[in-house]
C-alpha cells in the first residue's frame, strides 16, 4: 500500500475543517437571526481555522534576531492587487494596541468579514501565484486547488452580518486552537438538527404564505374602499341630477305662468289701446272747436300708443326667446332622460346607500325653500301688476262713461239747434221767446264748458297715472330680464352637472377596469401561493446535480440552496440576492425565482 503525501493529507484536513466551520457558522447565524459579535463561538472557531489555513506552507523569513513566520505579509500584499483594500490596511495599521504582525493579520480578517469582501480579497491573492511563491511553499494550501475551494466557500459568508469590536481585543496573545467538539456530533444530534432544519423551513414557508395573505387582504380592502367611495359619489351625482331636473320643471312651470300673464297683459293693453283710439276719434269729432287743447292730448296719446306698442314688441321678443329657451331645455331634458335610462342598470346597486345623502338633501331642500320664497315674491309682483291693470281698466271705463255723456249732450245740442232754425224760419214772432231760450241754452253751454274743462283736467291726471303705470311696466320688464339671466345661469349649472356626471361615469369605468386587472393579479398570486405551498426544502444528500444547468457537484462546484423554492443549485445558477417576506435581509435565490420575483414586484408597482 502506497503512503499518501502528508502535505496533501494536511490540505484535505484543513479543507474539511474549513467546510465544517463555514457551514456551521452560516447555519447558526441564520438560525440566530441577529448581528454576530466577537463572543460568538462558531465565529471564533472560523477565525482560528482561517488562521491555520493561511499558515499552512508559509515560508520562514530570517531576520537579524529571529525567525519570522507570519501571515501578515501575504495579507498586506492584497493592497497592491485590490485598490479598495487600501482602506482596511490603513485602518489596521492605525489600530492602537497591536504590536505583532499576527495581531494585525487577525484584525485584518475581522474587518474583511465585516465588509463582506474576504472572498474577493483572497481571490485576488490566489490568482497571483508568482507573488504568493515568495511567502508560501509550493505544496501550501494557498498554492493548490484547496485554496480556491476555500475562497469559493467564503462567498457564502456574505449573508452574515457581523459587528466586531477590534480595538478592545487582545489579538496579539490569543492562542488559535481548533475545538473539534463543535463538529463531532452523535446520531441523535444529527437527527434533531435535521428536524430543526425541516421545522425552520416549514416555518419560513408558513411566514411567507401569511405575508402573501396579508398583502392580498390589504389590496382587496383598499379596492373595496375605493369602490365604496365611488359608489357614494355616484349616488350624490344622481341626487343632484334629480334635484336639477325638479328645478328645471319648476322653472318651466314658472315660464308658462309668465307667458300666460304676458298674454293677458298684451290682451288688456290691446283693448286699452283700442278703447283709447275710439275715445280719441270721438273726441276729435265732437270737439272740433276746442281742437287745439285736444290735439295736444291726442299727440300725447299717440306717443303713449307708440311706447306701448314698442313695449308690446319687446315683450313679444322676450316671449319668443323664452319659447326657444324652453325648446332647448326640453331637448336637454330628453337627453338627460336618455342618459338616466341608460345608467339605471348600473345605479340599481348603488341606491341602497341613500341614507348617507340625507345631509345633502337637507341642503338642497333649503335651496328649494329659497327658490319658493323667490317665487312668492314674483307672484306678489304679478298680483301688483294685475291690480294696476284693474285700476287702469276702471279709469278707462269712467272715461268711456264721460264720453258717452258728452256725446249725448252734443246730440241734444244739435237737435235743439235744428229746432231753433226751424222755429226762426216759421215763427218770426216768437224770436224773443227763442232768444230767452237761447240765453238759457248759453248758460247751459257755459256750464257744459266748465264741465268739459274739469273733465280735461281729469283726463290729464289719468294720462299722468298711465305714464306712471308705463314706468312700472318698464321696471317689471327689467325684472323679467333679470329672471331670464337667472334662468341662463341655471342652464349653465345644469350643463356643469352634466359634465361632472360624465366625468364620474368615466372614472367608474376606469375603476371597473382596474378592479378586473386587480382580480386577475389576485388570481395569479393565489396560483403562485398554491405552487409555493407545495415547495419543500431539499436536503444536501438528495442533490447530486444542479437543477438548472444539470452539472455535477464537486469540490470546486459546491451546492447552494435557493431560499425561495428550497432547491439546490450551483453558484452560477444561484448568484442572486433578494429580500423575501420570510427574511427582511437579502438572501440567495436561483435564477428562475429571481426572474419570477422581479416580475411580480414590477407588476405590483403602479
From Swiss-Prot:
<dbReference type="GO" id="GO:0008270">
    <property type="term" value="F:zinc ion binding"/>
</dbReference>
<keyword id="KW-0175">Coiled coil</keyword>
<feature type="binding site">
    <location>
        <position position="573"/>
    </location>
    <ligand>
        <name>Zn(2+) 1</name>
    </ligand>
</feature>
<dbReference type="Pfam" id="PF01363">
    <property type="entry name" value="FYVE"/>
</dbReference>
<dbReference type="GO" id="GO:0005634">
    <property type="term" value="C:nucleus"/>
</dbReference>
<feature type="binding site">
    <location>
        <position position="546"/>
    </location>
    <ligand>
        <name>Zn(2+) 1</name>
    </ligand>
</feature>
<dbReference type="InterPro" id="IPR047333">
    <property type="entry name" value="FYVE_RUFY2"/>
</dbReference>
<feature type="binding site">
    <location>
        <position position="570"/>
    </location>
    <ligand>
        <name>Zn(2+) 1</name>
    </ligand>
</feature>
<dbReference type="InterPro" id="IPR037213">
    <property type="entry name" value="Run_dom_sf"/>
</dbReference>
<dbReference type="InterPro" id="IPR013083">
    <property type="entry name" value="Znf_RING/FYVE/PHD"/>
</dbReference>
<dbReference type="Pfam" id="PF02759">
    <property type="entry name" value="RUN"/>
</dbReference>
<feature type="binding site">
    <location>
        <position position="565"/>
    </location>
    <ligand>
        <name>Zn(2+) 2</name>
    </ligand>
</feature>
<dbReference type="InterPro" id="IPR000306">
    <property type="entry name" value="Znf_FYVE"/>
</dbReference>
<feature type="binding site">
    <location>
        <position position="549"/>
    </location>
    <ligand>
        <name>Zn(2+) 1</name>
    </ligand>
</feature>
<protein>
    <recommendedName>
        <fullName>RUN and FYVE domain-containing protein 2</fullName>
    </recommendedName>
</protein>
<keyword id="KW-0539">Nucleus</keyword>
<feature type="coiled-coil region">
    <location>
        <begin position="210"/>
        <end position="534"/>
    </location>
</feature>
<feature type="domain" description="RUN">
    <location>
        <begin position="37"/>
        <end position="169"/>
    </location>
</feature>
<feature type="binding site">
    <location>
        <position position="593"/>
    </location>
    <ligand>
        <name>Zn(2+) 2</name>
    </ligand>
</feature>
<keyword id="KW-0863">Zinc-finger</keyword>
<dbReference type="GO" id="GO:0005737">
    <property type="term" value="C:cytoplasm"/>
</dbReference>
<dbReference type="InterPro" id="IPR011011">
    <property type="entry name" value="Znf_FYVE_PHD"/>
</dbReference>
<feature type="binding site">
    <location>
        <position position="590"/>
    </location>
    <ligand>
        <name>Zn(2+) 2</name>
    </ligand>
</feature>
<dbReference type="InterPro" id="IPR004012">
    <property type="entry name" value="Run_dom"/>
</dbReference>
<keyword id="KW-0479">Metal-binding</keyword>
<feature type="zinc finger region" description="FYVE-type">
    <location>
        <begin position="540"/>
        <end position="598"/>
    </location>
</feature>
<comment type="subunit">
    <text>Interacts with BMX.</text>
</comment>
<feature type="binding site">
    <location>
        <position position="562"/>
    </location>
    <ligand>
        <name>Zn(2+) 2</name>
    </ligand>
</feature>
<keyword id="KW-0862">Zinc</keyword>
<dbReference type="InterPro" id="IPR047335">
    <property type="entry name" value="RUFY1-3"/>
</dbReference>
<dbReference type="InterPro" id="IPR047332">
    <property type="entry name" value="RUN_RUFY2"/>
</dbReference>
<dbReference type="InterPro" id="IPR017455">
    <property type="entry name" value="Znf_FYVE-rel"/>
</dbReference>
Amino acid at each position: 500500500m502506497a503512503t499518501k503525501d502528508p502535505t496533501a493529507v494536511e490540505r484535505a484536513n484543513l479543507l474539511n475543517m474549513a467546510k465544517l466551520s463555514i457551514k456551521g457558522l452560516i447555519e447558526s447565524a441564520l438560525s440566530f437571526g441577529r448581528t454576530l459579535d466577537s463572543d460568538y463561538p462558531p465565529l471564533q472557531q472560523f477565525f482560528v481555522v482561517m488562521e491555520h489555513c493561511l499558515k499552512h506552507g508559509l515560508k520562514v523569513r530570517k531576520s537579524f534576531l529571529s525567525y519570522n513566520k507570519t501571515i501578515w505579509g501575504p495579507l498586506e500584499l492584497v493592497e497592491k492587487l485590490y485598490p479598495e483594500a487600501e482602506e482596511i490596511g490603513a485602518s489596521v495599521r492605525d489600530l492602537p494596541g497591536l504590536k505583532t504582525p499576527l495581531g494585525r493579520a487577525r484584525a485584518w480578517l475581522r474587518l474583511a468579514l465585516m465588509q463582506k469582501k474576504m472572498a474577493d480579497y483572497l481571490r485576488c491573492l490566489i490568482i497571483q501565484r508568482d507573488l504568493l511563491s515568495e511567502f508560501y511553499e509550493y505544496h501550501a494550501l494557498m498554492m493548490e486547488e484547496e485554496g480556491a475551494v476555500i475562497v469559493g466557500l467564503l462567498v457564502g459568508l456574505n449573508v452574515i452580518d457581523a459587528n466586531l469590536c477590534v480595538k478592545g481585543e487582545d489579538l496579539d496573545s490569543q492562542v488559535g486552537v481548533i475545538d473539534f467538539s463543535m463538529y463531532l456530533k452523535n446520531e441523535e444530534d444529527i437527527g434533531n438538527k435535521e428536524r430543526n432544519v425541516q421545522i425552520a423551513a416549514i416555518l419560513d414557508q408558513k411566514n411567507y404564505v401569511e405575508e402573501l395573505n396579508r398583502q392580498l387582504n390589504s389590496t382587496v380592502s383598499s379596492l373595496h374602499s375605493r369602490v365604496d367611495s365611488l359608489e357614494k359619489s355616484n349616488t350624490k351625482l344622481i341626487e343632484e341630477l334629480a334635484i336639477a331636473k325638479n328645478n328645471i320643471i319648476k322653472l318651466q312651470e314658472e315660464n308658462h305662468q309668465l307667458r300666460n300673464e304676458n298674454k293677458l297683459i298684451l290682451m288688456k293693453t290691446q283693448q286699452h289701446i283700442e278703447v283709447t283710439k275710439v275715445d280719441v276719434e270721438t273726441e276729435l269729432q265732437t270737439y272740433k272747436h276746442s281742437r287745439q287743447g285736444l290735439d295736444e292730448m291726442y299727440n300725447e296719446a299717440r306717443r303713449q300708443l307708440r311706447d306701448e306698442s314698442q313695449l308690446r314688441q319687446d315683450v313679444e321678443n322676450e316671449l319668443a326667446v323664452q319659447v326657444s329657451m324652453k325648446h332647448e331645455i326640453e331637448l336637454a331634458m330628453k337627453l338627460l332622460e336618455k342618459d338616466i335610462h341608460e345608467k339605471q342598470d348600473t345605479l340599481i346597486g348603488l341606491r341602497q346607500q341613500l341614507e348617507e345623502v340625507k345631509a345633502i338633501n337637507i341642503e338642497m331642500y333649503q335651496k328649494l325653500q329659497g327658490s319658493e320664497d323667490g317665487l312668492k315674491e314674483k307672484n306678489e309682483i304679478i298680483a301688483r301688476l294685475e291690480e294696476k291693470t284693474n285700476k287702469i281698466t276702471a279709469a278707462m271705463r269712467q272715461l268711456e262713461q264721460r264720453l258717452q255723456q258728452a256725446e249725448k249732450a252734443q246730440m241734444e245740442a244739435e237737435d235743439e239747434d235744428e229746432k231753433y232754425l226751424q222755429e226762426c224760419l216759421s215763427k218770426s214772432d216768437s224770436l224773443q221767446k227763442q232768444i230767452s231760450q237761447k240765453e238759457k241754452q248759453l248758460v247751459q253751454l257755459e256750464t257744459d264748458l266748465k264741465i268739459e274743462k274739469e273733465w280735461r283736467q281729469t283726463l290729464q291726471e289719468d294720462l299722468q297715472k298711465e305714464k306712471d303705470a308705463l314706468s312700472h311696466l318698464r321696471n317689471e320688464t327689467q325684472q323679467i330680464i333679470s329672471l331670464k339671466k337667472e334662468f341662463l345661469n341655471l342652464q349653465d349649472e345644469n350643463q356643469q352637472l352634466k359634465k361632472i356626471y360624465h366625468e364620474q361615469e368615466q372614472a367608474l369605468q376606469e375603476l371597473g377596469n382596474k378592479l378586473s386587472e386587480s382580480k386577475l393579479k389576485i388570481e395569479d398570486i393565489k396560483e403562485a401561493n398554491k405552487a409555493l405551498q407545495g415547495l419543500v426544502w431539499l436536503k444536501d444528500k438528495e442533490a447530486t446535480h444542479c437543477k438548472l444547468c444539470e452539472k455535477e457537484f464537486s469540490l470546486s462546484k459546491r451546492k447552494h440552496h435557493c431560499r425561495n423554492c428550497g432547491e439546490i443549485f450551483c453558484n452560477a445558477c444561484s448568484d442572486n440576492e433578494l429580500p423575501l417576506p420570510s427574511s427582511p435581509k437579502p438572501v440567495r435565490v436561483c435564477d428562475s425565482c429571481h426572474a419570477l420575483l422581479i416580475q411580480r414586484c414590477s407588476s405590483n408597482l403602479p
